[in-house]
């Protein structure tokens, strides 16, 4: 059976926004895995909406801030997960989930990798520090991204 991995840094994202994609993948014969920080539910008080969906969940100790050392642990956990499961597809969301998943996928030769950018942190009017940090990181990570999905025109134009 083919395997797909969905990655977000906070749990709750998939049941809130991605269930149609999960159903499509499952109907295409994929076993769907979800890597997230389930200790940090978002878009709801708990992770009960994942029960009965057939999604296989994996705890990854993501932190939202890119400056937290715990994200090194999260990267290692993701890399190990990818090595153990040999995923046929990785679809990542959220800035930290997207960054660490793309690095881990590259270093484990896992792919293709899809990244959905739900609004870059560098945009017209954003603080200069955002441009100094996030823009070069995203430019670097773009080489490890097979498909980039942008949800707004400004991000799409910038990504081209």
Language-model features and meaning:
Residues 3-5, 105-121, 138, 149:
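Active-site proximal beta-strand in glycosyltransferases
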Residues 90, 141-152:
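A short beta-strand/loop micro-motif in the catalytic core of glycosyltransferases
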């Amino acid at each position: 059976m083919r395997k797909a991995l969905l990655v977000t840094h906070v749990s709750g994202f998939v049941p809130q926004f991605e269930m149609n994609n999960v159903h499509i993948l499952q109907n295409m014969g994929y076993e769907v895995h979800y890597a997230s920080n389930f200790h940090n539910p978002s878009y709801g008080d708990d992770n009960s909406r994942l029960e009965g969906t057939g999604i296989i969940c994996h705890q990854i100790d993501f932190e939202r801030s890119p400056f937290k050392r715990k994200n090194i642990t999260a990267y290692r956990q993701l890399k190990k997960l990818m090595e153990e499961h040999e995923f046929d597809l990785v679809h990542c969301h959220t800035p930290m989930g997207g960054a660490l998943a793309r690095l881990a996928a590259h270093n484990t030769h896992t792919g293709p990798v899809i990244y959905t950018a739900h609004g870059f942190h560098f945009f017209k009017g954003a603080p200069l520090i955002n441009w100094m940090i996030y823009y070069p990181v995203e430019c670097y990570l773009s080489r490890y991204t097979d498909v980039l999905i942008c949800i707004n025109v400004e991000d799409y134009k910038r990504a081209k």
